Swiss-Prot record:
This is Vacuolar morphogenesis protein 6. CHCR repeats lie at residues 614-786. The lineage of its organism: Eukaryota, Fungi, Dikarya, Ascomycota, Taphrinomycotina. GO terms for cellular component: cytoplasm; cytosol; fungal-type vacuole membrane; nucleus; vacuolar HOPS complex; vacuole-mitochondrion membrane contact site. One of its GO terms (molecular function) is guanyl-nucleotide exchange factor activity. The gene is vam6. GO terms for biological process: autophagy; endosomal vesicle fusion; intracellular protein transport; positive regulation of TORC1 signaling; vacuole fusion; vacuole-mitochondria membrane tethering.
Amino acid sequence: MHRAFSLYRVLELSKARVECVFELGGLVYVSNSNGDLDSYKIYNNEEEEAADFVMEHVDVYPNFTKKPITKVVSCATQDIFYALSDSQVYVYQISTFKKLFSFGAHCQNMCLYGDELIVLSSKKNLEIYEIQKNSKPNLTKTISLNDRPRSLAWVSPTMILVSLSNDFCAVNTETSRISSLNLAWQQSSSLGLGISYIGMSIKSNKLHITRISDDEVLLSKDSQGLLVNLKSLQVSRNPLRWPTVPQAVIYNSPYIITLHNQYIYIWNKETYAMIQQIGISNIYSTFSCHKNTFFTSNSYVWILTPEDFSNQIEALLNTENLNEAISVLSQITVSQFPKRDYYLRITKREKALRSFSSGDYDLAMRLFSEISESPSTVLGLFPGLLDNNYSDAISILSMAPSQNESIESNVLFPGNHSNSQTDLRNGDAVSTVANNKRLRSLSTYLTDSRRKANRFLSYDEEHYFLQKKNLFLNADGTLVAKEKLEKIAVQIDTTLFLIYMISSPALVGSLLRLPNRCETSVVETNLLSAKMYRELVEYYYGKSLHEAALDLLTKLCDEPTDTLSLKGKSNTTSKYEPILSYLEKLSPELDHLIFKYSRVPLSEDPQNSIVIFIDENSEASTISKGVVLKYLETISYKVSIIYLEKLLLDNKFNDTVFPTRLALLYLKRILELEETTDFKNQEVFKQTIEKLEDYLTNSKQYDANVVLQEINSQDEFLSTVSIILYRRLSRHQDALDVYLKILNDWEGALSYCNSVYSIDGETEPYYMLLAEISKNYKSGSLNILDFITKYSSRLDLNRVFPLLPKNISMKSYHSLFSSQFRQLFEELSNKETQSKLYQKRLEDLNEELTKVRSEKVVITREKTCLFCHKRLGKSVISIFPDGSVVHYGCAKKYVSSNHLPYEAY
């Protein structure tokens, strides 16, 4: 315990009883039972040793009120205060103490909400008043309760917390709804039972409402206290326990003050620890002012004033009560104690050092994080870590801290570490369990420091120094320079990497995938020795060390499969999958690396490797197709063909350039194969020609003229290719020349003519072939008469007769002319039949027209529409085949409603 408050007797009373004490404008006012109001000036009396505080009488306001004042609340923004006297509320001006007006009746208590609202409790009612500037408050609502309210506290503009005789409730001022808090009070023996010969009575509970902050309130019932969150109206912590039922409960940050029969107890709000016990008795009233608390008895007025926080903290530190010092400092503000941040830092720092020495590494590192201790200083607890070359991470991090390399204690705490450090070095700390605990706690601290360092480094110079409160500080409390912070960030990431390597290898990948500042040499050495190639490749990628990554992947691909420790590698037929996956992630600006390291995979496994330039998820697919194709041609025509074929399948050609280049590449590939020995029997040669023929036949995008120019007319293996191109260009004579002069294939030429006719309906090739037949009739070509007879329906006889041989007898023409006559007769017969059908149809239509014209409908004045049942009159009508008559506008609806098998127009 330490001395947090001092109690002084400041005023000896005369015959008048003190009913109220309050502070206004730097003076203390005492309301006496006779209605007089005395003002006092309170100050330290340094001349006398017996009394440190003196209340010097300043003025008196005789008969200030008819009855004594029992409670005062002030509203400094409006220069007024409210005084409760004789069950009424009087409003006075603070500067002049002039009474302005009064309001309320039968009032027993009051509570102010800012300068907007005031609530009065009278008997079993709550009266809500709206404060109006320079005028009397306006009563807005009266709420009835089941019991007399004792104490009040505003929760929000629409919610009031009220204590009744035995419970607390929340009152909604808008809806007048009253809700019990239903708090979990535990049964206490202090309630007691009073038993006498005439009966039994239960002592009533004493309930108190003490406002802690805008978000929290302390509710006291009997000998218990509950901290309640005002937003949720839920208990936030375990209950406090008073030694006896308190007469009053007061909050003076950061302490809770309870008045009992013979003592005043001071409690720490956070730890519930009793800080101080002060003896006092015969107190009948308590008044809490802005800073001080006044107690009155029948003879004296006492003042309870807080000690200076500097003295309190010094006392706690001198007694090495660090936990209590940290708790007190955490609850107060800089306005209460200007050196609050400094003392909080050095106290937490000392607590962290002692926790580390005693083996509580988690607490130590958490405290170091809270005070933003420099990582360089914390890492000093691990000897040799900062100066070593990191080649042997396990031996470095498993060492216990030595006395020389530990953080030096602050001058406020001399000589507190040597023994504990010696025990740590010689005891359990060198064990595996202790070392793992140290590593885990250090990793937690470094993770938090890493986040802070990255944020601090993102600040500009001006903003950096404005954030002094949050930045890393050196051991002497000075700010870590931004230049040094860069080096510290490297130490943090590198050390965290080493810790993960030892204690949590699974986390190494997640660290290296994020932006980091790890030392490259350290990462390479440790990951290579551990054969964690996948993590090393990810690190290289994050650092843009792409050549190093690709060199490593190339080396690993050349090794046997069982030595390739690339975790997560998918089952694939390509051993170059790791290289290809890495190349897919490189941006187009790094095309020189993509081309350099994809050459070997493309040469040996083109089908699987070419995907890096095709897949839409690959960055390499955005490289210009022309650039890629030019590069692929330096590897082989085969790879280039595969590339363009896959593009063709994806319909990525918008012009004739690349489709034409694909055809030309086929030709180059064929010529390349023709230079090999025994190429005629090679399956690949046959397949390439078949692919070219199929492509030229089915594709519509290539430029046939360009392709045709590259074909050697003397190459018999490309004759079919030439024919396809001639046909595409409608150069049928050239195509027939290839059939007849190069291939000597008359049947093939005839098939060509039939194919052109069946697809395009063109008959010109027949005449060209007929001309060739007539020239070579004697050389055993096709029989010209059989040809003309067979295809006479497709030919014009006027063009055919000049081509007929003149040295053939007329008898030979019998079959030709017979077929012609049969064809002409058939055409004539078809025309006559068609004419008769047309005539019959015309007669049927005329008959139907006559019938329709003969039909009539008589519309009388009484005839109505079958749909709307209104008279038809002279309206436009629709007549249906069954004789139904409706309005023209009702026709469609009539058809729809009756489901008729025809439409109305």
